[in-house]
Amino acid sequence: MMEGQQHGEQLKRGLKNRHIQLIALGGAIGTGLFLGSASVIQSAGPGIILGYAIAGFIAFLIMRQLGEMVVEEPVAGSFSHFAYKYWGSFAGFASGWNYWVLYVLVAMAELTAVGKYIQFWYPEIPTWVSAAVFFVVINAINLTNVKVFGEMEFWFAIIKVISVVAMIIFGGWLLFSGNGGPQATVSNLWDQGGFLPHGFTGLVMMMAIIMFSFGGLELVGITAAEADNPEQSIPKATNQVIYRILIFYIGSLAVLLSLMPWTRVTADTSPFVLIFHELGDTFVANALNIVVLTAALSVYNSCVYCNSRMLFGLAQQGNAPKALASVDKRGVPVNTILVSALVTALCVLINYLAPESAFGLLMALVVSALVINWAMISLAHMKFRRAKQEQGVVTRFPALLYPLGNWICLLFMAAVLVIMLMTPGMAISVYLIPVWLIVLGIGYLFKEKTAKAVKAH
């Protein structure tokens, strides 16, 4: 373990097991559930519950694959390290940069959502103004130290978790006590055109947006380098997070869709806030809007942390400028936080230029980057496992269903891309994947050329 203050190129270990569990949980309870679920409900109806169960299973397989690797070798930069070591230098380079871009895009989507939530109270404030204000505040906090991040994220996540549990209990009470009015009945789950009102197709077409909700679970891997005891904390966090996610997602959506017919949900408001607003409970609606706002800020906070650590890892591998591989005397990678913030600031511009379509566009781009990310975790894990078997090493936290689980995940990713190609407004993000891979290829060649030139001198 690293004790005391480190200078130069060491991150400071300051995250406890409670921090790691809640960082992962906080990463997943965010805008995907609170805002993204609205468009899924419109298309899939109550079948959204089945969709979340399927995506949750895939996310769990991915988490266990990453978990197996991280427990054996806990390092900064998380799985790009494994892609590098077990797959090849381009795979490491590409996965690292893709992960960084993924979380920059997630950060942009969350800041956009913050703007939408503020409009619930102040419709006249443009989304770009709210995005700009919270952008400055959260980045300033992250420039303090990792303990502050851990504590802030811990309390952000606690608020979210308690609120979702309270909403499930309160919603359940409204439902079974009769206080929710005549429209609040469990039969809403199958009476309004059936459990799958638009058939299985309606659900399948929404799997990409559902997948957006599960992006963030891999944060467990990123926290490994700053965990006090990765061998114990990572397996514990990985296993417990998935049960909680299923309770929170499936439980909250089942209660929500029983309180009011799904047909009354609109796309641009959080269904959680809308339903209590419709029930005439303005206090609960306002309280829930505070919660969904906290949720978005919490995920954005995780993104700022995650981006800076990923970029730090890339710099240590020699895949990003060396200046980014330094930390200040408190163990904070200031340079990487500032560079990530600079790129994320584009979100303010996107919201200024296209306030209506900003969230949908960013969500589609996130899913494309997430597909690449999860596919690379699964492929890197297969290579990692083969290498360990050849060395005769028995890993301490084996992934589930290897290698079948890996193939199930890869088929799921391919299906999500096909669905996105068929979805208006999302296809563009799939067409950008080959463009992005070409950009990564050029970046990699430039890096190799520079490295050779330095060696020659």
Regions found by a protein language model. Name each.
Residues M1-A38, Q42-G47, A59-R64, A76, ...:
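Membrane-interface "cap" regions at the ends of multi-pass membrane proteins
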Residues M1-G8, H81-Y84, E110-A131, S163-A166, ...:
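Helix-loop-helix connectors at the membrane interface of multi-pass transporters/channels
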Residues Q6-L11, I48-I49, Y122-P126, I158-I290:
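Helix-loop-helix junctions that connect adjacent transmembrane segments
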Residues K12, L35-S130, F134, V241-I250, ...:
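Extracellular loop-to-transmembrane helix junctions
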Residues V75, N98-A113, F214-A227, T282-K322, ...:
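Membrane-helix boundary/coupling elements in multi-pass transport proteins
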Residues H81-Y84, G88, F120, M206, ...:
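TM-loop-TM module centered on a large, flexible mid-protein loop between adjacent transmembrane helices
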Residues G115, W128-A184, F214-G215, T238-I242, ...:
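Membrane-interface loop-to-helix entry segments
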Residues W155-F156, A323-V334, V371-P424, A453-H457:
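C-terminal membrane-solvent junction of multi-pass transporters and transport-like membrane proteins
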